[in-house]
Amino acid sequence: MSQPYVTAYVPWCKKWEGCCAWFYLDTRGNVTIWVGFEVPSALAAQSLPLYLSGGTLACTVQEKAAAWETVSSMQPGRLSSSYGYSGCPVMLPSDGDALLMAKLDALDEGLAAGIPGFEALPDAWKMACLDQAFNLGLHGFLSGYPHEIDRIEAGDGLGAALQCHRNGISDERNAWAAAQFKSVPA
């Protein structure tokens, strides 16, 4: 079962990452679905729970693979909504959220293993760490932000807030993460 702070982070994750029920190309041109779930191949697409547009008829593996091929050949750099087409397979919210929760729970476990004392941190700090791990990847966060990790381990929220800025994301998202570290003393 997910920790309460993991569940509390879900709406923020959807806000920052966006949420799209069909395949689209992310900013790097990778086929993606729901909240930033990269689908690396047509074969990988076949294992996803996808439905025809009405949401009641499950797609065949052939339909899933064909949809992946269709979207992978489209022009990248557009809004995710522009990749939907008549009859495109969709992911139901219950299935997409189950995938999201599984990913967040795995990141939470990885953070607990990678940051000594993580379990005892304030929930707001854990949410900021989840956001960074979701955005950067667990390894990218743990290895790419050593000064921030040091400040977290030391219980220095202000120091962590000063170190948590990421390039390439919105100022609003960076400010939200910093505010989480500033909001509660360890």
Residue ranges and their predicted role:
Residues 119-136, 142-143:
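Charged, low-complexity intrinsically disordered segments
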Residues 110-113, 135, 139:
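Amphipathic alpha-helical interaction surfaces
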Residues 1-127, 151-186:
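Acidic, aromatic-lined catalytic clefts of primarily extracellular/periplasmic carbohydrate-active enzymes
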Residues 42-45, 138-145:
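Short, solvent-exposed secondary-structure capping/transition elements
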